[in-house]
Amino acid sequence: MSAKTDEILESLKSLSLLEASELVKQIEEAFGVSAAASAGVVMAAPGAAAGGGGGEVAEEKTEFDVILESFDAAAKIKVLKAVRNATGLGLGDAKALVEAAPKPIKEGISKDEAEALKKEIEEVGGKVTLK
């Protein structure tokens, strides 16, 4: 690596979790990309591989996908805000996701996190399923 990339890497290592989160948001805004989309793809692969065995019924599912099925038209802005808060998406990406329902909001998350997200979105007028 070059000296410049080494220096950047060392700076990143010293960031707190909050600072790293803020940095990700700034990078998403500056470059028009979404870290959540690529993380969702990466996280979906292990879940798909685990589901391939299919023989053991006794094993409890540990990864869940939160699917926005629909929403009340009057609550669209509230649902949009809840989706943005949960995913970290920009306004345009979150709006496209909400308007394209049924669509996955988050994939490969824990049961507790999935149920909390479902409750949050249903409280503002969205209809959500867990898969």
From Swiss-Prot:
- What is the protein's known function? Forms part of the ribosomal stalk which helps the ribosome interact with GTP-bound translation factors. Is thus essential for accurate translation.
Recorded GO cellular component terms are: cytosolic large ribosomal subunit
Keyword annotations for this protein, in alphabetical order, are: Ribonucleoprotein, Ribosomal protein
Q: Which Pfam families does the entry mention?
A: Ribosomal_L12, Ribosomal_L12_N
Origin species, per record, is: Parasynechococcus marenigrum (strain WH8102)
Looking up PANTHER family in the UniProt record yields: 39S RIBOSOMAL PROTEIN L12, LARGE RIBOSOMAL SUBUNIT PROTEIN BL12M
Quote the protein name from its UniProt record: Large ribosomal subunit protein bL12
Quaternary state and interactors: Homodimer. Part of the ribosomal stalk of the 50S ribosomal subunit. Forms a multimeric L10(L12)X complex, where L10 forms an elongated spine to which 2 to 4 L12 dimers bind in a sequential fashion. Binds GTP-bound translation factors.
Q: Name one GO molecular function term.
A: mRNA binding
Q: Mind telling me which InterPro entries this protein's record contains?
A: Ribosomal_bL12, Ribosomal_bL12_C, Ribosomal_bL12_C/ClpS-like, Ribosomal_bL12_oligo, Ribosomal_bL12_oligo_N_sf
* Family label: Belongs to the bacterial ribosomal protein bL12 family.
Q: Which domain of life is it from?
A: Bacteria
GO BP field: translation
**Could you tell me which SUPFAM superfamilies the record lists for this protein?**
ClpS-like, Ribosomal protein L7/12, oligomerisation (N-terminal) domain
Q: Is Ribonucleoprotein found in the keyword set?
A: yes
